[in-house]
Regions:
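Short coil/turn segments at beta-strand junctions that form active-site/ligand-binding loops
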Residues: 36-39, 64, 143-145
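C-terminal catalytic/acceptor-binding lobe
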Residues: 111-112, 116-167
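Conserved catalytic core of nucleotide-sugar-dependent glycosyltransferases
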Residues: 34, 48-121
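A short alpha-helical cap/connector motif
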Residues: 9-11, 97, 107, 126-128, ...
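A short acidic (Asp/Glu
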Residues: 1-4, 25-26, 51-55, 79-82, ...
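Hydrophobic/aromatic beta-strand patches that form the interior of the parallel beta-sheet core
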Residues: 41, 68, 147-149
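Active-site-proximal specificity loops/subdomain of glycosyltransferases
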Residues: 1-38
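Short beta-strand-to-loop acidic/aromatic patch adjacent to the donor-nucleotide binding site
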Residues: 37-48
């Protein structure tokens, strides 16, 4: 599989670091190799995307978001899990966007936001699996905005976490 991917893009780095350490490795790579204005997209290995990802990510940033996810997590529709959830709805060129308190580790942001929130990213990744909910809650307390498109443009590939309304 890696050789097939390398035939498309030659800058593939294999690691055996685990979930949190792999994410932090990518954060460090982005900070060291990209300009602060550049966007990076972190994608977990168990997500499937619809087409036109780049246009949708650009659309999410156009509504003022610091962090954009194309995953419409079904937990946001579970009143027992989020009994007081209040969201702002934004209209982009391609989608509706909703402010959400958290998402999984598949999201886009600017390198500048990684630098600004580096302490939170590291604090959230001190265990094997990142504390994504904590991470986004903490960053939003600093004024960062996380939006999710509705309907989603990607989905988690676990049956209980499929994006609603997308076949």
């Amino acid at each position: 599989f890696v050789s097939e991917i390398k035939s498309i893009h030659d800058n593939i780095v294999e690691t055996a670091l685990g979930n949190s350490k792999s994410f932090l490795n990518c954060v460090e790579y982005a900070i060291q190799n990209f300009d602060e204005s550049e966007r990076v997209y972190f994608v977990e290995n168990d997500y499937l995307h619809l087409s036109d990802v780049e246009n949708y990510l650009n659309d999410g940033f156009s509504v003022g978001a610091s962090f954009v996810t194309l995953y419409d997590h079904p937990d946001k529709y579970n009143i027992s899990q989020y009994p007081t959830l209040q969201s702002k709805i934004f209209v982009g060129e391609h989608s509706h966007w909703r402010s959400v308190p958290s998402t999984c580790m598949t999201f886009a942001t600017h390198v500048a936001s990684l630098i600004k929130n580096k302490d939170i990213l590291y604090e959230s990744c001190c265990h094997e699996v990142p504390s994504d909910w904590y991470m986004f809650e903490k960053m939003q307390s600093r004024g960062e905005l996380l939006v999710s498109c509705m309907p989603g443009r990607c989905t988690h590939l676990e049956r209980d976490y499929l994006t609603p309304l997308v076949d």
